[in-house]
Amino acid sequence: MAMTVKKDNNEVRIQWRVADIKIPTSEIKNISQDQNIHEVPKLDRDKVSRIGSTFGKTNRVIIDTDDHEYIIYTQNDQKVYNEVTK
């Protein structure tokens, strides 16, 4: 199953395999991209959600909230980034 990332006025919704993650837009503090799939997250392990596969040429889109970090592994990082920052 392909990953879908959609944003509306209220939330960012990420669907991948059996996961259906909803992040309220009011809680989003920062959105960034990088290509370092091996970088260690800044937060504790239980406050990080890793979404997507890390094989091949995979980049990351990172969504930071006050208490959680969502790391989206994708080959379509620019498309995902554009969707969540629109």
From Swiss-Prot:
The source's superkingdom equals Bacteria
Q: Family membership, please give it.
A: Belongs to the UPF0457 family.
Checking Pfam families in the record gives:
bPH_8
Name this protein carries in UniProt: UPF0457 protein SSP0714
